[in-house]
Amino acid sequence: MYQEEIIKASKKIFNEFSDTCLQISDNKFFFQPAEKWSIAQNVDHITRSVKTTRLAYSLPKIVIRTLFGKANHPSITYEELVSKYKLKLEQGGKASGRYLPKTILSKKLFLIQKWQKENEKYLEAIELKWNDDLLDHYIAPHPLLGKLTLRELCYFTIYHTEHHLNIIKVRLTDQFN
C-alpha cells in the first residue's frame, strides 16, 4: 500500500470503529464479561496503541533513526504483516504494560472522542511528515512483532483496529442476543 492508500484505509477502519461504538448502548459498552475486556476497554486499548504508535511518526526523523536504527529489509506486505500478527496471537501474545486498558470510569462519548482525536493526530503526522520512501527507511519497535518499518507499523494499526472491531462485533452478537 502506498501512503495515500494507507491513509484512506486507516480513515475507513477508524470511522467504522467509531460508528460501531457510537451505536452501542451504554450498558453494553461498559458491560464487563468474565475474563475479557469490556467494549470500553477495547476502545481504551486501541486509543493507547494509536497514541504510542503516533510517537514514531511525530518525533524528528533523526531521533527515530538514532533510537531505533534504519530498516535493513524491505517492508513486508499488509497480508504478510497480518499473518505474522495472527501467528503471534496464536502463540499466546497479548497486550501488556502501557497497552493494558484501565478500569473505565469515563463516559462513552468522551472515550470515543479521545480515540478520534488520537487518530487525527496519527494521520496528520503520517500525511505531513512521511512519504513512501521514508516509510520504508525508518523502523520502530513493536512489543509483539519486533522492529517494523513505519509502513509495516501503519499496516499493523489498520489491522489492529479491524481486529478489535471484530471482537466488538462478535461480543455484541454472542453476548447480547
Which residues make up each language-model segment?
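Alpha-helical packing segments of well-folded alpha/beta enzyme cores
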Residues: 6-9, 13, 17, 49, ...
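Mixed-charge, polar/low-complexity N-terminal
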Residues: 3, 9-11, 17-18, 120, ...
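Acidic/histidine-rich alpha-helical segments that form the ligand environment
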Residues: 75-133
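Charged, low-complexity, helix/coiled-coil-prone segments
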Residues: 19-21, 53-71, 97-114
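A short small-residue
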Residues: 26-27, 95-103, 139-144
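Short, contiguous alpha-helical
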Residues: 28-83, 124-177
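An N-terminal domain-cap segment
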Residues: 1-36
